[in-house]
């Protein structure tokens, strides 16, 4: 339940473990679930995850950490990071140094490019998901679950939540927000200084740029599949032209960009800009609840669609506490934990499991959840959901923005 710094964890990464075989993935997958739980009891799990939301942090450290300690005697160390690549780089450095079973990272909240990097570098533990009792709640036949930004999951990570990009505005001051990318472009020019977006490599800023990229390409369907340089070049030239043309109309005339989604939210809260956005619409509700945003904030998707994805948890190849990480993953998938996560007061995140496969009492609780007025429903968003691109595309777009727009 406590949160440790990265430096502190690295300092103890090579400390011998009380149960050394909890690092042996092959041995664990040969055990029964009860045997895995016995191996995990009294242990520790170091979970590296984005730490920018107090509500998410409380859900993880308080609710999840409390259950782990009460039911299994497992200590959950939530390690807050600003970008998932920080955790990936720790594992990469350990792999290069030959640290094969005493790594500092036991689990990562992850998807997209970072998962691809771990798969390509043989840095993620695979082949264990069938050992999780709650794996039966996952619909692995759903391509949006079985593939992470076009990369097959292949038993190398476990879904945690679903999310879809949404825009937010204050209905008291902006009664009719722009509802499509071309409308947004026109609105920005008609309202100079009232819009901006975080610079790459910020995750949410990158997603906004991809929406413009989809528009420039004539639709997401023209970009699906493996990276295609010719298709990229055609869409990229149009995208950079659009964004550079918009720059003088942005906040501070585009001379500077927010460095993070947190910074953009602060500009919105201070009424310096009229809109913000997030890949997790529940964040708008949490901001209203904690007083950061006014109660008149509302959110929505675009008529031409917004990008959606699934996020996951993954266990590095050299985690010394794999048994405890498995118990944590199984708990995160459970009906009660997914219900609590979906509660607006806790987080409001959409479940990654099939609700119909949960126990009747959990299904009943899901049915009673009412989303906050500031949070657009996943049902409404889902009517115009756009797929994510494969990771090679995302890397190219991010680097292209830095070279052609950001510099």
Model-derived segments and spans:
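Extracytoplasmic/periplasmic substrate-binding proteins
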Residues: 251-318, 365
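Short, well-structured alpha-helical segments in soluble
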Residues: 91-100
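Conserved C-terminal helix/tail region of periplasmic/extracytoplasmic solute-binding proteins
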Residues: 21-33, 266, 372-407
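Short, polar/charged alpha-helical segment
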Residues: 33-41, 45-75, 167
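Extracytoplasmic ligand-binding site segments that recognize negatively charged/polar headgroups
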Residues: 50-63, 79-86, 101-262
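Gram-negative bacterial Sec-dependent N-terminal signal peptides
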Residues: 1-20
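Short, hydrophobic alpha-helical packing/hinge segments within bilobed ligand-binding/sensory domains
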Residues: 87, 115, 264-265, 325, ...
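Mature extracytoplasmic/periplasmic domains
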Residues: 306, 311-380
